[in-house]
């Protein structure tokens, strides 16, 4: 864990960090408010010394969309490339936002993932929609969305996703779900392989549970 937030590193400082082999085991790097522009962000994104980085805070810097995209690609590669032999990907409590899920949806290596856990992050139905629409998630059999504010809209997008047709286990505990979302699940043409469904901690009334009967 290295916190260098609120300093004046600029692009040159970012390049020094990117070229430092001593950071090869670093998992969390905080560089918010450091006047880092596109060249500095691209140096970090292309660094081979940050292969183990899981959390990167670059808020309030000066890079534009290309730099942001490159940094998202770095984080995505680092997260997914650590996929274990069981093909399970644990991305719990990593402060993932909608843009992070979009980056995941564009990464072809996601085709290898069989189990994906996204518990307690910061995305909503929009981020989930990006992921669910990706052809690269078609092999996922277990999906944990516990403690995310996806609501009925998120469940509807999930229910309408052909890429989710292999799902056997779905955890929707504490996801702000109501009976409207349950109806979407029950009527989904794609979620026919579900064997285990966790709906604990939601606002589902009697009518909602009847939809599942």
Question: What feature does the model see in each segment?
Answer:
Residues 2-4, 26-31, 56-58, 89-94, ...:
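Conserved hydrophobic beta-strand positions in leucine-rich repeat
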Residues 1-2, 193-195, 205-213:
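Short, intrinsically disordered, charge-balanced linker/junction segments flanking boundaries
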């Amino acid at each position: 864990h290295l916190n260098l937030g609120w300093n004046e590193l600029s692009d040159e400082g970012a390049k020094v960090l990117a070229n430092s082999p001593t950071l090869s085991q670093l998992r969390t790097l905080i560089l918010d408010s450091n006047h880092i522009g596109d060249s500095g962000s691209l140096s970090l994104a292309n660094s081979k010394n940050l292969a183990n980085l899981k959390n990167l805070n670059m808020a309030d810097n000066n890079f534009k969309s290309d730099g942001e995209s490159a940094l998202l690609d770095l984080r995505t590669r680092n997260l997914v490339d650590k996929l274990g032999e069981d093909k399970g990907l644990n991305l719990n409590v990593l402060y993932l936002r909608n843009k992070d899920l979009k980056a995941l949806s564009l990464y072809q290596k996601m085709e290898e993932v069989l189990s994906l856990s996204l518990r307690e992050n910061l995305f909503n139905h929009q981020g989930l929609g990006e992921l669910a629409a990706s052809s690269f998630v078609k092999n996922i059999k277990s999906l944990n969305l516990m403690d995310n504010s996806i609501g009925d809209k998120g469940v509807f997008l999930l229910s309408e996703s052909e890429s989710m047709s292999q799902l056997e286990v779905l955890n929707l505990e504490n996801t702000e779900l109501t009976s409207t979302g349950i109806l979407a699940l029950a009527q989904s043409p794609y979620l026919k392989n579900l064997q285990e469904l966790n709906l604990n901690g939601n606002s589902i009334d009697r009518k909602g549970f009847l939809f599942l009967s």
